[in-house]
């Protein structure tokens, strides 16, 4: 569209680098299967840091990018919109909005890039990673704010409809599976 600009992402999002220096922030977040989830900061299982002072403090409406192991992992989702204040590993890129933008719109845009595997050609190094300096050059659309919000709202509604259809189908499958088991039990 004529009113849309194409800009490097650094024009609309900067990097959020605010360390949890004194360990005061305790809401531990992680990117898992394309969703930012809460984790128990007091857990004893798995690989854990000795403290969380090096973790980044992130805010609602930031966007998280997991830029590691681009050459190996071509199935997981690497982007998500942050929905709450917390801390996350500094291995991730945390994008903070610079201007009046719809973070939901940019989440959907970056998610579409993620699904199309755009990030895989951007990394470098032995483990093929990506840093903010490289990521900042990524070209993105910049429509007017009202259009960003309209697109994000439309996608929110359509995605909610699809999620409801999926939930309904899962319920139908569970019902049919129960019927199948009952039928087998009755006739055997």
Regions found by a protein language model. Give the residues of each.
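Short, flexible domain-boundary/linker segments around small modular repeats
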Residues: 144-146, 153-158, 162-167
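Non-catalytic DNA-recognition/assembly elements of restriction-modification systems
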Residues: 1-20, 137, 145-149, 182-183
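Interdomain signal-transducing alpha-helices
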Residues: 106, 148-151
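A short glycine-rich beta-alpha junction/loop motif
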Residues: 86-91, 124-149
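Short amphipathic coiled-coil heptad-repeat segments
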Residues: 1-3, 160-188
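A short beta-sheet element
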Residues: 56, 60-115, 131
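A structural connector/turn signal
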Residues: 47, 52-53, 83, 125, ...
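Sequence-specific dsDNA recognition surfaces
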Residues: 10-63
């Amino acid at each position: 569209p004529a009113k849309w600009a194409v800009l490097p992402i650094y024009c609309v999002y900067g990097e959020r680098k605010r360390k949890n220096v004194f360990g005061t922030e305790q809401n531990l977040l992680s990117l898992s299967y394309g969703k930012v989830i809460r984790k128990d900061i007091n857990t004893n299982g798995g690989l854990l840091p000795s403290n969380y002072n090096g973790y980044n403090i992130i805010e609602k409406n930031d966007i998280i990018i997991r830029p590691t192991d681009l050459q190996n992992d071509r199935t997981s989702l690497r982007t998500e919109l942050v929905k709450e204040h917390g801390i996350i590993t500094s291995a991730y890129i945390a994008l903070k909005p610079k201007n009046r933008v719809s973070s939901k719109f940019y989440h959907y845009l970056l998610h579409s890039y993620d699904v199309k595997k755009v990030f895989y050609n951007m990394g470098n190094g032995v483990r093929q990673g990506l840093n903010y300096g490289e990521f900042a050059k990524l070209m993105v659309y910049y429509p007017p704010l009202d259009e960003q919000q309209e697109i994000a709202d439309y996608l929110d509604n359509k995605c909610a409809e699809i999620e409801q259809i999926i939930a309904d189908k899962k319920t139908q499958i569970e019902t049919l599976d129960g019927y199948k088991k009952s039928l087998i039990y009755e006739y055997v």
